[in-house]
Amino acid sequence: MMLTPFSVLLLLAPWSGSYAEASVESSQPESDVWITSGIVSDLSLPDTLRGELEVKYGDLSVVKNGTLTPAQTAEAPTMVKLRGAINCIPPFALVMLDPDVPSRENPTERSKLHWMVLNVNSTRKLHEGDVAVPYRGPNRTSGSGPHRYVFLAYCQGAQRVLTSEIAPQQRSNFDLADFFKKLRAGNPFGGNFFYAENA
């Protein structure tokens, strides 16, 4: 049977569609949220995060740009996974941070590290790995306004690392650029964020 260029395109269409669905998940509207929230500029992130992290606290899902309470997020997430696919191999790293310390208007201690997990084997279980910095939920001073809590996932350059060499000595003034330099990582391959406030 002779295949014309048109018939080849028809044969390839289902495969191409599924690939696009995995990689286009954070298209322009999603990158707009990262930009308008100020996270891209405040953390010097790329304009577009190619993947979205699905984060759950029990039955509660983190909705990007949504709001949760400190009580709802007091314990570590029960699930963090990537929606879609990436072009790097394990292991992976996950961080959660608050860039609004002590407040968004006066972030003199940007950022505070709330969680760090290294040497993760699967993008479907980014919460399972070597815990370099134990989880600490949102607990900012009452009256400091809404804080952004940001999850970011990175490739580790195909090598496992020692948590003692990567974890910072303190949570405050966490230098994200220094972190992925030590990790030999590039830009984050996925992220999510929510707001929380102590009334």
Specify the residue positions occupied by each region the protein language model found:
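N-terminus-centered regions that define maturation/targeting leaders and the start
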Residues: 2-199
